[in-house]
Curated annotation (Swiss-Prot):
Keywords assigned: Repeat
Residues in PPR repeats: 87-121, 122-152, 153-187, 192-226, 229-259, 260-294, 295-330, 331-361, 363-397
Name this polypeptide is given: Pentatricopeptide repeat-containing protein At1g31790
PROSITE patterns attached to this UniProt entry: PPR
Domain of life: Eukaryota
Species of provenance: Arabidopsis thaliana
A UniProt-annotated Pfam family: PPR
One record GO biological process: RNA modification
Example of a GO MF term: RNA binding
Protein family membership: Belongs to the PPR family. PCMP-A subfamily.
Length: 409
């Protein structure tokens, strides 16, 4: 007789919910396995040979798909069905959840639920609701709530102000700042330097030069210039650069005893915008002499400036060597600028080396830059080959390159 090993069917697994409030999803874990083996041993005659054991393997239990995360609306409905009263702690958690998930519907239902409740919200709690609506992109609701607030603190003003900046409503942001300034003069709060930096950005966007100059004077009055705040200094340099006042921008830079990367990057941007390409290269050299760290923005503007300097690409090669030394050559934007610069000077082989050194084969800008370099130097066959490779890879080429390729074909 042969020996049989029988595996009973698995018992139903117990569902143990695993909630993780720090993650974006909740999962229902299931790692339960059952294995009840029963063996029936029968006497075997001596004249029979032993046969192999037949094993019926137990099928593995597949884990269930993770359950979807409960939304703010679901929790509010559950509270209503159980007649659970709400409080500021619960509502604050739900407001934070709606803000993180950009849940406009949940934010609206939470607002209605709070209005129907009997709680008397504090300023801190209302600020949480303001932040929720701003995060959900509802600046209109935020302004309505803000305008109806009988008392406001600095956070109330800052949330609405930054919401206007984030949404691109720069005129309203400037108007809010003027109102905030009047409110702060009553001793309610002090305006920090980063608010003034944001106001300067708004002034540049709405082309209000006079208001920006008044903000600069306010920076002196409040002592922020003496503190040499890097963000504020960079904002001032960018502001004057937007209005093509390079002398004023450079004066702000030279007044700094320890100008950092932010301030110098703003100066490099201003000089490139005004077509001062030699000055951009001098800025780059000056940063190196003073030991100031360079960032991607600085390298990008300097390489673009090198494309317009008639030196056969020598300046660009030196900047390239510096980029390799500091580890910026692997950046997608820097590689694109290098390909454009080498293509401008007819150094196609150098452009190809930069292009082929990339480990990321899906960089659209680098592929288009390499095609443009080929066409710029009359190497249309290689350009068309590269366009076919882009099509096979699923990379979209610029329409101007495609039109020029069709003309050459």
């Amino acid at each position: 007789m042969k020996t049989l090993e029988l595996a009973l069917p698995p018992s139903p697994p117990s569902l143990v919910p695993s909630f993780n409030y720090n993650s974006t999803a909740r999962s229902v874990g299931n790692d339960v396995r059952t294995n009840f083996d029963v063996q029936l041993f029968l006497r075997k005659p001596k004249h029979q040979k032993s046969e192999p054991v037949v094993v019926i393997q137990q099928p593995q239990i597949q884990p269930q798909n993770p359950s979807s995360r409960c939304s703010t609306s679901d929790i509010l409905r559950l509270m209503d069905s159980l007649s659970l009263p709400g409080n500021e702690d619960i509502y604050s958690c739900l407001a934070k959840e709606s803000a993180r998930e950009n849940d406009q519907r949940g934010a609206h239902e939470l607002q209605v639920h709070i209005m129907k409740s009997s709680i008397r919200p504090t300023i801190t709690f209302i600020n949480r609701l303001l932040l929720m609506h701003v995060s959900c992109g509802r600046l209109d609701i935020t302004r309505q709530m803000f305008d109806r607030m009988p008392h406001r603190d600095f956070h109330s003003w800052a949330i609405v102000f930054l919401g206007c900046i984030e949404m691109g409503d720069y005129e309203d942001a400037a108007f809010l700042f003027v109102s905030m300034l009047k409110h702060s003069q009553k001793g309610a709060f002090k305006i920090p330097s980063w608010i003034l930096g944001c106001v300067l950005k708004a002034c540049a966007m709405i082309r209000d030069f006079e208001l920006g100059k008044q903000v600069h004077a306010l920076c002196h009055k409040l002592g922020f210039i003496d503190e040499e705040d890097s963000y504020l200094s960079g904002s001032l340099i960018r502001f004057y650069g937007e209005f093509r006042c390079l002398e004023d921008a450079n004066l702000v830079l030279h007044q700094l005893s320890n100008a950092n990367t932010v301030a110098w990057a703003a100066k490099v941007t201003n000089d490139y915008r005004e077509g001062e390409f030699q000055e951009v290269i001098r800025d780059f050299i000056e940063m190196g002499n003073h030991g100031i760290k360079k960032n991607v923005s600085v390298f990008s503007n300097v390489l673009k400036a090198c494309s317009w300097v008639s030196d056969g690409g020598r300046s660009g090669q030196q900047v390239h060597a510096n980029a390799i030394k500091l580890g910026f050559e692997s950046d997608c934007l820097i590689r694109c600028r290098l390909i454009e610069m080498y293509g401008k000077y007819g150094k196609v082989k150098d452009a190809e080396k930069v292009f082929k050194s990339s480990k990321d084969e899906t960089s659209v800008s680098c592929w288009n830059a390499m095609v443009a370099s080929y066409m710029q130097n009359g190497i249309y066959i290689e350009a068309i080959k590269l366009l076919y490779q882009m099509k096979a890879t699923g990379i979209k080429a610029h329409d101007t390159l495609l039109n020029e390729a069709h003309l050459q074909m």
